[in-house]
Amino acid sequence: MRTSQYLLSTLKETPADAVVISHQLLLRAGMIRRLASGLYTWLPMGLRVLRKVETVVREEMNAAGALEVLMPAVQPAELWQESGRWEQYGPELLRLKDRHEREFCVGPTHEEVITDLARNELNSYKQLPINFYQIQTKFRDEIRPRFGLMRGREFIMKDAYSFHLNQESLQATYDGMYQAYSKIFTRLGLDFRPVQADNGSIGGSGSHEFHVLANSGEDDIVFSDSSDYAANIEKAEAVPRESARGAASEDMRLVDTPDTKTIAALVDGFGLPIEKTIKTLVVHGAEEGTLVALIVRGDHELNEIKAANQPLVASPLVFASEAEIRAAIGAGPGSLGPVNLPIACIVDRSVALMSDFAAGANIEDKHYFGVNWERDLPLPEVADLRNVVEGDPSPDGKGTLVIKRGIEVGHIFQLGTKYSEAMKLSVLSEQGKPVNLIMGCYGIGVSRVVAAAIEQNHDERGILWPSALAPFQIALVPLKYETESVRQATDRLYAELTAAGFEVLLDDRDKKTSPGVKFADMELLGIPHRIVVSDRGLNEGVLEYKGRRDSESQNLPIGELMSFITEKLSR
């Protein structure tokens, strides 16, 4: 492809509204343009990258036995009403009416549509298991779209849905999708981690997220430094570093603590080690009208997902108001603790191993110091309630935990029968009895992968595409293309490279565009290999080569270039 016949829309300046590096570089490289809040047009250069992601995804899904379909983006309200999600889904669901006043939505996801398809097309166990997928545009009406493709309102997603008679069949397909996703992100050249995840409101028995590691990631992911254990921060099990509770060495005493409403004030005002303090948080109980106290160590953070999964606690998690707390306990936040606590209490595992600790006395402006379990009060229910911290023991007993930032680009779920029961999807079993099908769902944010790849692969000059994603493999840059010898040599080399199957962008812009601008544009675009043709080089029988990740260029004999490039691109 010649730049004279292509849309090369690079920008020198970074648009003011672009915050994250992927958004900045996608705009500067002329790969996308903003149409409206959270809506982007893909320009030819960016579309080449997007199509490469789609190709790898499609190849691996096909290899895993999934069948491609294409479902409508606009969906009838009746299906969502049938599943119960029409009322449950928030304002992110874009609803509309047609000229006949029938209600529809623009699909943020396709569980209802695929379940409707399955109940109309599947009628026998002999058709199972089966796995459908599509690559389709989705829409979620985010209140504050931001970060370009990372959190837009319209996005491109690969979503797959599988149907099974039993859990064993689902597990086999789920494992196959796990392997397919691992192959996809490996082929795309991304540094990623699959992590255990919480199913949340989706339900089901298994879930994994796939995260691209990047400092700009929105999510904390946790993995062992010595094993394959990995989980997101919501799911990671927090194992105490202490193996046993220390012996009591202080008597419990009541201490006046005026104006001490925070852990920081307690530590600073009384010289206490933070690991000898606790935080008491009060939430609504599962039984209507009840409250439950959740206690974590002062230097730890409550994991709200783990808390909401406790049988005594209401889900979703609702924190009690100060008025509710005072009415139930007689003291306000900052003075709460487990001693003489009149409501149910759950303590974190690390709290259960504490000795000689400080806790609110449930009396305004007073704390107990030197508190010890079993001696001063019975040990209440113990559960894993906190977020892990770096250096915690790995739950599998191998090594310690490392925490890094990640960008979620894929998620696989074992859905169970949530949709098949709600929408009456069943087939006849081998015994001739109707059986509700068990479902799995598997998503990849195709357009988000493009942004995540840039977040992980860039430098001060622009994008550093992994080779599988680069819009072109080779940038061919002639100096003084108007010179006959340079033009002939460049055109000949361009013909040879394209005939060999390489994707080449020939920068044939005229002499008004300086070599420096050409080089800067090719680096901004992230094209992995650059070849420079010049009069001087031709006179010396060489071409200049520079890899995008190289610090220095090198001269290659003209006759060796094809074998050199072929070897480079075969790695």
UniProtKB/Swiss-Prot annotation:
Disulfide bond entries: none
GO cellular component: cytosol
Pfam families tied to this protein: HGTP_anticodon, tRNA-synt_2b, tRNA_edit
Gene3D superfamilies xrefs: Anticodon-binding domain, Bira Bifunctional Protein, Domain 2, YbaK/aminoacyl-tRNA synthetase-associated domain
InterPro entries on file: aa-tRNA-synt_IIb (IPR002314), aa-tRNA-synth_II (IPR006195), aa-tRNA-synth_II/BPL/LPL (IPR045864), Anticodon-bd (IPR004154), Anticodon-bd_dom_sf (IPR036621), Pro-tRNA-ligase_IIa (IPR002316), Pro-tRNA-synth_IIa_bac-type (IPR004500), Pro-tRNA-Synthase_IIa_type1 (IPR023717)
Catalyzed chemical reaction(s): tRNA(Pro) + L-proline + ATP = L-prolyl-tRNA(Pro) + AMP + diphosphate
Function: Catalyzes the attachment of proline to tRNA(Pro) in a two-step reaction: proline is first activated by ATP to form Pro-AMP and then transferred to the acceptor end of tRNA(Pro). As ProRS can inadvertently accommodate and process non-cognate amino acids such as alanine and cysteine, to avoid such errors it has two additional distinct editing activities against alanine. One activity is designated as 'pretransfer' editing and involves the tRNA(Pro)-independent hydrolysis of activated Ala-AMP.
Family that this chain belongs to: Belongs to the class-II aminoacyl-tRNA synthetase family. ProS type 1 subfamily.
Subunit relationships: Homodimer.
Domain comment in the entry: Consists of three domains: the N-terminal catalytic domain, the editing domain and the C-terminal anticodon-binding domain.
Name of this protein: Proline--tRNA ligase
